[in-house]
């Protein structure tokens, strides 16, 4: 696991080595073990590529950049390739010679043999850049799910790319203007999905794509990574259950290859419990499992992780944390995202990563289980949308919404359940794009139009995704496809990457496996959600290893009481961000409208937890990063 950087600039326009080292320094936390640089002159440009390394595989010989045998090609790489041994053996049989045991060298050798068509053969999480001197081009690629980040920007004098925004921006003469589409997306979704960033002219490379940069003319094109889809044959649910079992076991096995200590995050939920079980079954010695508990019983679920640990006989590490532990790290965590990000579960993810780092360098997680196997309530609720809209006329529906809205508005909602009920009812749509509404956890378009100034609001901010993924969402497969592009890539994986990398620990997600994704896409919806039983086929595959009904117990997740914090220890900071003079100078918000929304929450007139937290996170970024 590492961080990578690179740029193409006009010759003699910058001190390339100093700039590259600055970029590496800004992402030192991603790879504190070593660093490397490559600089060359090509045509009218200077080309630079750098990286910082967190050593996991081939610790002694895996430093980068890595060169081809004839020095004509060079690579810097962030991530892990889980099938690299299989690919390496195939290449050796074709006559390739390897100098290291690293997966980085395998990527480069495979590229030498097959070009960018080889990228689809990689099973793993990655962002890398390959410079090919024979054709004067750089290829910059990102993995299938988007586990590893990659930002890029074309400027008047060249092209820049980096693992984190802070590194890329250090190469620009000034910070770009705020992108209004990204601004609206953030306040709707509470995160900014690829390809957008908060800055004009800077983009995220979307998952499963690569950039082809022509260094002769400073021109680039973006292509989807071609890959063959795995086909599966099954005649019954029992067959599908066996395939599920084997695919999950194999994925855990491939993701447990490491030359450094490894363990699992064990929350006690279905996904992390199954990953931990598989790893325990595959290892000869006790595995290390890690969980956090809360000193407040309302938020604590550590009994579930203890139960699983006892079942699989793991060496369990449990860290009890308080609200003070969470709030003490807010600045460090939120500002590390480099752009507005309002998923409050990042606070707990950071803490479990930080505490786990004292014991292991790699942790397997249950991330992706809900998206791959159909684990969200919103999936079967989505199926009810068509039934509901066919039975309930719009006029009656909106009367129901108004009544429930008034009923729930003044209630406290620390876990967001009442908010979700209100959001669910308001998102029911008679025009078939229900699911895009239900995943919008922030403001509605009407609310955004009210609180944002005219020049800051962008209507139809989700249109890019509706055009790319599809407008109509009527099946679980549709919902999962939307989540893969938006919530998984833009929220979940960003959260895990930034919080774990901030503590210099590598997280691996066995459920984020292309074969598993292909397989579950070929299953009937009823195999994923059977009545009210979510992740049905996954539970069927592993139920024999757990006590009866254990896998059907609900889990609350990393909920934190941000609504209370905004009325207490965060209130002074929040009110500073609401200062009239500051808001007028900022020229983004309507002062009267945003003040009313915030003050209604602070005075407990209306529970606006999610909206006010989103506003708070944006203002924290604006004041401490954008204005800094």
PLM feature segments, named:
Residues 85, 105-108, 181, 196, ...:
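Non-catalytic, well-ordered alpha-helical scaffold segments
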Residues 137-139, 148-149, 169, 371-375, ...:
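Short catalytic/ligand-binding loop motif for oxyanion handling, primarily in non-cytosolic enzymes
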Residues 1-337, 349, 353, 544, ...:
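Cysteine-centered catalytic environments shared across enzyme families
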Residues 331-335, 357, 379-381, 565-567:
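Short low-complexity, flexible loop/linker segments enriched in glycine and/or proline
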Residues 351-411, 487, 496-516:
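Active-site adenylate/phosphate-handling loop in enzymes that bind or generate adenylated species
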Residues 338-343:
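Short, flexible loop segments at the rims of nucleotide/cofactor-binding pockets, characterized by
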């Amino acid at each position: 696991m590492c961080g990578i950087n690179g740029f193409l600039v006009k010759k003699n326009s910058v001190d390339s080595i100093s700039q590259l080292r600055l970029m590496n320094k800004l992402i030192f936390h991603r790879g504190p073990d070593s660093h490397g640089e490559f600089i060359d002159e090509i045509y009218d440009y200077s080309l630079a590529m750098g990286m910082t390394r967190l050593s996991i595989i081939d610790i002694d010989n895996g430093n980068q950049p890595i060169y081809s045998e004839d020095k004509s090609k060079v690579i810097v790489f962030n991530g892990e390739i889980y099938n690299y041994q299989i690919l390496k053996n195939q290449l050796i049989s074709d006559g390739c010679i390897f100098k290291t045991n690293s997966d980085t060298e395998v990527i480069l050798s495979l590229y030498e043999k097959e070009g960018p068509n080889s990228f689809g053969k990689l099973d793993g999480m990655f962002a890398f850049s390959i410079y090919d001197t024979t054709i004067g081009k750089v290829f910059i690629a990102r993995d299938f799910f988007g586990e590893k980040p990659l930002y890029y920007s074309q400027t008047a004098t060249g092209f820049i790319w980096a693992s984190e925004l802070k590194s890329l921006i250090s190469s620009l003469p000034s910070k770009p203007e705020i992108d209004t589409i990204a601004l609206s997306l953030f306040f709707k979704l509470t995160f900014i999905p690829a390809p957008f960033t908060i800055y004009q002219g800077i983009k995220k490379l979307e998952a499963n794509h690569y950039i082809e940069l022509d260094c002769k003319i400073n021109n680039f094109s973006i292509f989807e990574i071609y890959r063959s889809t795995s086909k599966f044959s099954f005649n019954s649910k029992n067959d599908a259950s066996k395939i599920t079992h084997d695919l999950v076991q194999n994925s855990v096995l491939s993701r447990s290859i490491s030359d450094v200590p490894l363990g699992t995050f064990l929350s006690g939920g279905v996904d992390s419990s199954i990953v931990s079980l598989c790893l325990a079954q595959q290892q000869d010695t006790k595995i290390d499992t890690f969980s956090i508990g809360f000193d407040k019983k309302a938020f604590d679920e550590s009994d579930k992780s203890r139960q699983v640990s006892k079942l699989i006989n793991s060496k369990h590490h449990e860290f009890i944390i308080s609200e003070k532990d969470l709030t003490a790290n807010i600045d460090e965590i939120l500002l590390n995202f480099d752009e507005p990000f309002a998923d409050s579960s990042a606070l707990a993810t950071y803490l479990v990563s930080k505490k786990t780092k004292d014991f292991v360098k790699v942790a397997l997680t249950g991330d992706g289980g809900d998206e791959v196997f159909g684990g969200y309530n919103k999936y079967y609720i989505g199926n009810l949308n068509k039934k509901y809209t066919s039975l309930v006329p719009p006029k009656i529906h909106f009367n129901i919404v108004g009544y429930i809205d008034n009923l729930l508005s003044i209630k406290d909602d620390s876990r967001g359940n009442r908010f979700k009920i209100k959001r669910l009812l308001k998102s029911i749509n008679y025009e078939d794009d229900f699911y895009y509404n239900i995943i919008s956890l922030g403001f509605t378009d009407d609310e955004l139009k009210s609180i944002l100034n005219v020049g800051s609001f962008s209507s139809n901010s989700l249109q890019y995704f509706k055009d790319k993924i599809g407008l109509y969402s009527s099946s679980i497969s549709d919902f999962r496809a939307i989540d893969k592009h938006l919530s998984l890539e833009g929220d979940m994986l960003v959260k895990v990457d930034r919080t774990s990398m901030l503590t210099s620990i590598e997280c691996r997600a066995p459920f984020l496996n292309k074969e598993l994704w292909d397989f579950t896409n070929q299953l009937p919806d009823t195999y994923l959600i059977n009545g009210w039983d979510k992740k049905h086929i996954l539970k069927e595959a592993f139920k024999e290893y757990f006590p009866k009904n254990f896998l059907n117990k609900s889990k609350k997740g990393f909920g934190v009481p941000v609504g209370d914090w905004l009325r207490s220890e965060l209130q002074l900071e929040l009110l500073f961000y609401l200062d009239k003079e500051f808001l007028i100078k900022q020229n983004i918000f309507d002062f009267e409208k945003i003040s009313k929304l915030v003050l209604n929450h602070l005075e407990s007139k209306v529970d606006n937890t999610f909206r006010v937290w989103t506003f708070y996170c944006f203002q924290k970024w604006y004041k401490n990063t954008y204005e800094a």
